[in-house]
Amino acid sequence: MPYPKSMVEPMRKELTRLGIDELKSPDDVDAAFGAAEDETLLLIINSVCGCAAGGARPAVAQALETGPTPDHAVTVFAGQDVAATDYVRDTHLPGIPPSSPFMALFRNGQPVYVIERKHIEGREPAAISADLVEALQAYCTDEAPPSDAPSRPDLSSSPNAGGLPSTFQSIS
């Protein structure tokens, strides 16, 4: 059962006020991805969880402010826009385990960079934003991305994945 609309509305607005378009149905997903077929598109799977509020949404705001920006930015809300969320995962993210919050950068219709929940939990918005900015700099350009362009955040340099105990398990 979807979350109550009144509960998620403020969480939606944190992204829509940035100019990010909401996708509430599979038709919305098809239209957005069709419009971005030969361009870049940032997909954010929003969530009610604390790591979305304290990490993912602020990181997106910081990254878009820093730039560069994708040609399109869209969001679905897990637990609210159930059909759209399931459809975007099944259609555009095959083989990538579902998680929320979640971000994916697409270039020419293909996912080229993903930030999963496990890359968000226990990390500061600035660190998540830096990962996203690195991806935007690599892929949101007219030039071909460098051969060593990242596809996921590199957490190897941060001990215990952002200070989490080694026994911590993400609930992706």
Curated annotation (Swiss-Prot):
Signal peptide (from-to): none
Biased composition (Polar residues): 154-172
One Pfam family linked to the record: Disulph_isomer
Region Disordered, residue ranges: 141-172
Biological processes per GO annotation: cell redox homeostasis
Listed InterPro entries: BrxB/BrxA (IPR009474)
Domain of life of the native organism: Bacteria
Family designation: Belongs to the bacilliredoxin family.
Protein name from the UniProt record: Bacilliredoxin SRU_0242
Organism: Salinibacter ruber (strain DSM 13855 / M31)
